[in-house]
């Protein structure tokens, strides 16, 4: 764990955490033995069991096996990915919280609504400000090209302006994510409802076809309301006249259904 506190050089691909060195074949075998002993039943034989991370953490394991047990999932705070801290909160942080200059007005908050309850708050027009930022990007890029042709050493300020414009544009696009999620869910529910309605229509259509086939059989003199003939206990017994008639009626029903389809 001493290596974790040392500063590592930045690389294109982050190195694995130091704890991977504990995942040796011997340690894995020891952990399997501990799980087998803990899962023994009354007969003394190990039982097949799917261990949850909570159950594994409750086992009495030696210190060298602690890294093999999944840690508890954090519910708050931050985690590090490629050397950058990421928040566990799903809320989109504002640009001011990230120390970035915001080039568009912030949406009205609840405090502003309570101060002026008679005036309804106007929602932020994302498309309008996205268009303005896009035009500013084109203008700043032209200025950047001009600076490179006249005084290339003065490019840093213009690059910072372009970077700030891109960050603001991406942040505005990310504000659409909740709306995109709602619309995607609505679309999925509408597709599911449409499939259910199609299945119901197919069932109603099949019901009408069967009803029409039965009505046609009644017109032909076939007694479709008669009780079905139970199959004989002896499979080798030959069918009698009534059984043959029932089989023939069934065959006629299927032929009529095939003709309608």
Curated annotation (Swiss-Prot):
Role of this protein: Component of the Mediator complex, a coactivator involved in the regulated transcription of nearly all RNA polymerase II-dependent genes. Mediator functions as a bridge to convey information from gene-specific regulatory proteins to the basal RNA polymerase II transcription machinery. Mediator is recruited to promoters by direct interactions with regulatory proteins and serves as a scaffold for the assembly of a functional preinitiation complex with RNA polymerase II and the general transcription factors.
Keyword tags: Activator, Nucleus, Transcription, Transcription regulation
Compositionally biased tracts (Basic and acidic residues): 23-46, 234-244
MF (Gene Ontology): transcription coregulator activity
Family, per entry: Belongs to the Mediator complex subunit 7 family.
InterPro entries referenced in this protein's UniProt entry, alphabetically: Med7/Med21-like (IPR037212), Mediatior_Med7 (IPR009244), Mediatior_Med7_sf (IPR044888)
SUPFAM superfamilies for this protein: Mediator hinge subcomplex-like
Gene3D superfamilies: 6.10.140.1520, 6.10.140.200
Self-association and partners: Component of the Mediator complex.
UniProt-recorded name of the protein: Mediator of RNA polymerase II transcription subunit 7
GO terms for cellular component: core mediator complex; mediator complex
GO biological-process terms attached to the record: regulation of transcription by RNA polymerase II
Region (Disordered): 1-56, 99-121, 223-244
Protein localization: Nucleus
